[in-house]
C-alpha cells in the first residue's frame, strides 16, 4: 500500500494553488472560483458513478482519484481543512450509520 495520503494531497493542492494559473491546473481551478471547481467535481463524480455502474474497475480507480483531488480543491476554496472533514467522519463512525442518519433527520 502506498504511503501517500489525502493529507499529502491537501498539501500539494495548497502549494499548487499559489502558482500561476497559466502554469498549474490547481491554480487555474482556484482562480476560477467555487462555481468552476464545484462543476468540475460534479463532472468527475458522474464519471466515477458511471465507471462503477459499468463495473469498469480501472476507470473507477482513475475517476475516484479525480474526485478526491477535485474535492480537496473545492475544500481549499471554501477554506475547510481536510482535518475538519476527517473529524466529522470520526464523529459519525462513533455511532451506527442508521442512528447517525436518524439524528440528522430529526435536527
From Swiss-Prot:
EC number: 3.6.1.31
Primary location recorded for the protein, binned into one broad class: cytoplasm
Gene Ontology, cellular component aspect: cytoplasm
CDD domains per the UniProt record, alphabetical: NTP-PPase_HisIE_like
EC category: hydrolase
A GO biological-process term: L-histidine biosynthetic process
UniProt keyword Acetylation present: no
Alphabetical UniProt keywords: Amino-acid biosynthesis, ATP-binding, Cytoplasm, Histidine biosynthesis, Hydrolase, Nucleotide-binding
Protein's name in the database: Phosphoribosyl-ATP pyrophosphatase
Organism of origin: Rhizobium etli (strain CIAT 652)
Gene name linked to the record: hisE
